[in-house]
């Protein structure tokens, strides 16, 4: 009777799975789906052409609740009767993700797990049951769990029967993305492998193998999408931060929420693995067999970063997992991999490799990123107002990790040398060479991590400075356009804008200094870009100051305060130059967000070439000439143009530092730096600050200074010429031609003169003349 009942149940479930909804969804080309990637606009499937499209409103991103996902499905598919959502079984690859307020979408590719938008009354999925496979199902009316929970139940059930999970679907919905049961197909191990190899890797019936231990994910369904998204974000975070001027603020909270479950899961799986590997001999045999397998990507085409234990190296190494299939030598983190395989495999390695060098239990340098608790946590988290504090913590963690690893290697080196005392000389050399290479690798890896850390930090600081400068300039222009304008408010906004530009200039110089120290070739390549950026800052400030001419009353009232403000900036630049000369640079990554400005040690010198670019060309004009500017009664302020003066045809009054400056006349501007002993290099700074000077009122003093300078220069030149002439003597150490017709006495005299002989009579008369 039981076999007959089983056949009846199977037929009933199959008939239910083959039912077709009656709401008109059968005529759609593709199933309604939505996909999210924090920091990017949401994507949805076009049911007419089967292609992924960006959010139609251009504003929705990264919805954190299932209710919000259901509402979003109803918004993007208003013509369909969306009643529920369920997480898809397979991750998908989607291109052309867009950012907010961006007209053009970049061709970045991300692998995410979408949500299916269920239309009409719920109908279970139709599951194909291959030969020798079994169709199973479980229902619990007292349980209402998520898709991920039931996926884990199905997989564990198949594992208990020594089979693989082939396909599965949800049963009996009890809420939004919550169900009371699951239907699934289990196939024998050999049959499942054959079916997967023969099937298309991108079809929906391929098995999603989540890797690692069978951890309980019942409470972490929302975090799974975020973790998969984080793995893909690591691949392009540097490029995103270098190209974009805006920060991904939407992803902060979601990533922070994902960190705690991730750490808890890691600790839990590590403790379970440690206990398992020390229980019985049979368990150790199983673990040894698992850790001896080669890494398998699997038939799917995803790019998920995972770790496997390399028996030949005696350590865990990274590889890319395709998303399905593969074997059990597949771990989420390096710590979990070493916890499972490290202790068990160490005994086997000692037995089989006694003639070789001892294996290193310390993680050897790899091209992959550091552990999540070191640099990755900083790199994966978008920048915010506490960027400098986060950077300092990441830098300290990086240095502490490097010191710990170096200390461990040194201790092992000492132990190896003690054990190698009785070994042949060749073996001793091999031990020394082995550890020398390891130390060099650790140093190189630390240098690469520092470089990556600093470059990411610099890019984030640059984006923040751009936002601050833009906001300060907008507030300054708004204050000038107010009716009536308030001089005090205008001055405060101008002061904030000047400080923002000063921060931008300081950051540019700091970045050039760091690049020059770590990569002189790259510094030579970006030299022209740095110069162009400094020129743009200079001209942008002059234009902003010139906007006061459009409001003469305000300009006249705050003239003294602005003069004092610009004079303070001049004094600050002098202090920067003095500190830079006296204090060597001993750390990396100092930036414009540091609280103390007295720690600044860097400036840049812009040197003229061939006399085509003089110091006077960089002197800004006095921004106040109210009498020479017509009154502006409408308080209209033109927007600031950041182009060079020659390109926009900027006109200035006589005496202006920008008068007659043309970009084609400036053939080249060199930024030269010299290394001085152990203190690194010093780059001197031509003062790119903006002073309010009244050139016309000091013409007499300037002429007097010029005349005095000419007189002093003349005296110095004459003194140098006389001193140089006095040094000339009749001593000659070169070859003197000797005439063959001279007498032997004259020839002998010539030889004596070549050897330094001087006629006392001649020397006496020379001294008398002098």
From Swiss-Prot:
Name of the protein: Amyloid-beta precursor protein
Residue ranges that the UniProt entry lists as topological domain Cytoplasmic: 723-770
Residues annotated as binding Zn(2+) 1: 183, 186-187
Major localization class: membrane
Gene, per the UniProt record: APP
Site (Required for Cu(2+) reduction): 170
Functional note: Functions as a cell surface receptor and performs physiological functions on the surface of neurons relevant to neurite growth, neuronal adhesion and axonogenesis. Interaction between APP molecules on neighboring cells promotes synaptogenesis. Involved in cell mobility and transcription regulation through protein-protein interactions. Can promote transcription activation through binding to APBB1-KAT5 and inhibit Notch signaling through interaction with Numb. Couples to apoptosis-inducing pathways such as those mediated by G(o) and JIP. Inhibits G(o)-alpha ATPase activity.
Residue segments, region Copper-binding: 135-155
Cystine bridges: 38-62, 73-117, 98-105, 133-187, 144-174, 158-186, 291-341, 300-324, 316-337
């Amino acid at each position: 009777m039981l076999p007959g009942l089983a056949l009846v149940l199977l037929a009933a479930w199959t008939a239910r799975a083959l039912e077709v909804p009656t709401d008109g969804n059968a005529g759609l080309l593709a199933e309604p789906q939505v996909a999210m990637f924090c920091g990017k606009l949401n994507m949805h499937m076009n049911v007419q052409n089967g292609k992924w499209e960006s959010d139609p409103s251009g504003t929705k991103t990264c919805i954190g609740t299932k209710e919000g996902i259901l509402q979003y499905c109803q918004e993007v598919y208003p013509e369909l009767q969306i009643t529920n959502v369920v997480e898809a079984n397979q991750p998908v690859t989607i291109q052309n993700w867009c950012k907010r307020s961006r007209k053009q979408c970049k061709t970045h590719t991300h692998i995410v797990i979408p949500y299916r938008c269920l239309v009409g009354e719920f109908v279970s999925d139709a599951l194909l049951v291959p030969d020798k496979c079994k169709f199973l199902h479980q229902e619990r009316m007292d349980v209402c769990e998520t898709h991920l929970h039931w996926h884990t139940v199905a997989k564990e059930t198949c594992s208990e029967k020594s089979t693989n999970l082939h396909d599965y679907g949800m049963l009996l919905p009890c809420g939004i993305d919550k169900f009371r049961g699951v239907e699934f197909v289990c196939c024998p191990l050999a049959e499942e492998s054959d079916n997967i190899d023969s099937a298309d890797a991108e079809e929906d019936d391929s098995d999603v193998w989540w890797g690692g231990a069978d951890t309980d994910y019942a409470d972490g369904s929302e975090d799974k999408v975020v973790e998969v998204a984080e793995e893909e974000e690591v691949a392009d975070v540097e490029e995103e931060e270098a190209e974009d001027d805006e920060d991904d603020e939407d992803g902060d909270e979601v990533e922070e929420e994902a960190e705690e479950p991730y750490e808890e899961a890691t600790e839990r799986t590590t403790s379970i693995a440690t206990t398992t590997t020390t229980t019985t001999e049979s368990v150790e045999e199983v673990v040894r067999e698992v850790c001896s397998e080669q890494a398998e990507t699997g038939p799917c085409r995803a790019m998920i970063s995972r770790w496997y234990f390399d028996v030949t190296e005696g350590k865990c190494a990274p590889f890319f997992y395709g998303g399905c299939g593969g074997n059990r030598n597949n771990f989420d983190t390096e710590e979990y991999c070493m916890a499972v395989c490290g202790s068990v495999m160490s005994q086997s390695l000692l037995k089989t490799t006694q003639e070789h060098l001892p294996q290193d239990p310390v993680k050897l340098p790899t091209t992959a990123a550091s552990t999540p608790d070191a640099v990755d946590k900083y790199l994966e988290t978008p920048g915010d107002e506490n960027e400098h504090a986060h950077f300092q913590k990441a830098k300290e963690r990086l240095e502490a990790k490097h010191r710990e690893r170096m200390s461990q290697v040194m201790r092992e080196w000492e132990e190896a040398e003690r054990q190698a005392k009785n070994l042949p000389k060749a073996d001793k050399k091999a031990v020394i060479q082995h550890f020398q290479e390891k130390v060099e690798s650790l140093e190189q890896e630390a240098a690469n991590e520092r470089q990556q850390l600093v470059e990411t930090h610099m890019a984030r600081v640059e984006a923040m400075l751009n936002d601050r400068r833009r906001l300060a300039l907008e507030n300054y222009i708004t204050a000038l356009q107010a009716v009536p304008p308030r001089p005090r408010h205008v001055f405060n906004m101008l002061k904030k804008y000047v400080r923002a530009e000063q921060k931008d200039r300081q950051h540019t110089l700091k970045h050039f200094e760091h690049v020059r120290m770590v990569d002189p070739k790259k510094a030579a390549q970006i030299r022209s870009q740095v110069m162009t950026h400094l020129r743009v800052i200079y001209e942008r400030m002059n234009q902003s100051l010139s906007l006061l001419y459009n409001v003469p009353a305000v300009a006249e009232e705050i003239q003294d305060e602005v003069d004092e403000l610009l004079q303070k900036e001049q004094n600050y630049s002098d202090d920067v130059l003095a500190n830079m000369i006296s204090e060597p640079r001993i750390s990396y990554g100092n930036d414009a967000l540091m609280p103390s400005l007295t720690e600044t040690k860097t400036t840049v010198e812009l040197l003229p070439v061939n006399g085509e670019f003089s110091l006077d060309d960089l002197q800004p004009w006095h921004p106040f000439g109210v009498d020479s500017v017509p009154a502006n009664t409408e308080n209209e302020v033109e927007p600031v143009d950041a182009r060079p003066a020659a390109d926009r045809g900027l006109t200035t009054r006589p005496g202006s530092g920008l008068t007659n400056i043309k970009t084609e006349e400036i053939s080249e501007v060199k930024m030269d730096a010299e290394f001085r002993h152990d203190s690194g290099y010093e780059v001197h700074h031509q003062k790119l600050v903006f002073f309010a000077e009244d050139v016309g009122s000091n013409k007499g003093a300037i002429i007097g200074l010029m005349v005095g300078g000419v007189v002093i220069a003349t005296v110095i030149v004459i003194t140098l010429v006389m001193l140089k002439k006095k040094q000339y003597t009749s001593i000659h150490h070169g070859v003197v031609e000797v005439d063959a017709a001279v007498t032997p006495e004259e020839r002998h005299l010539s030889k004596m003169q070549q050897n330094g002989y001087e006629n006392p009579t001649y020397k006496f008369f020379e001294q008398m003349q002098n």
